[in-house]
A protein has these predicted regions:
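Acidic, metal-associated active-site segment
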Residues: 45, 86-102
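Short loop/helix-cap segments at secondary-structure boundaries that form the rim of catalytic
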Residues: 56, 111-117
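Short active-site oxyanion
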Residues: 31-34, 61-63, 97-102
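Short, well-structured N-terminal submotif of metal-dependent ribonuclease cores
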Residues: 1-37, 46-60, 124
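Alpha-helix capping/helix-boundary segments
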Residues: 10-11, 41-42, 71, 92, ...
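Short, polar loop motifs at secondary-structure junctions
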Residues: 48-51, 106-110
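Acidic catalytic patch
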Residues: 61-82, 108
């Protein structure tokens, strides 16, 4: 994998110490990858209290991708091309496409629909 993006489902899985996300991240870190966490995914899981501690530690080893105007417009076009796609998923998917990343997600079907063939979608 060229890179790894974590969506909200992956962050929640990490928060819950799910072994699948731990394995995915272990592989990424051994390969020297710095996972990307889209800011919109972080916004979906962050609560601003003690429950965020595990995710906060993970973020120290990740790159948080801001939602730029360019990304927002591209995600809007992707939503238009993918009926039923959600805004957050489209923002995440566009970044994955642009970077050529694999994605760790619990939202397999929607991400596959948005990303199309050729993108590695890892279930958490």
């Amino acid at each position: 994998m060229a890179g790894l993006t974590l969506d909200a489902g992956a962050l929640i899985a990490y928060e819950r110490a799910d072994p699948r996300i731990r394995e995915i991240l272990g592989t990424a870190f051994r390969r020297g990858l710095v996972p990307t966490v889209p800011a919109v995914a972080l916004a979906e899981v962050w609560r601003g209290d003690a429950r965020d501690a595990r995710v906060a530690r993970l973020l120290k080893a990740c790159s948080v991708e801001p939602l730029s105007e360019e990304l927002a417009r591209a995600a809007g076009r992707l939503r238009r091309e993918t009926p039923g796609a959600g805004t957050v998923d489209a923002c995440i998917a566009w970044g994955v496409r642009r970077r050529g990343d694999a994605i760790a997600t619990s939202d397999i079907d929607d991400m596959r629909r948005l990303l199309g063939p050729g993108v590695t979608v890892l279930r958490v």
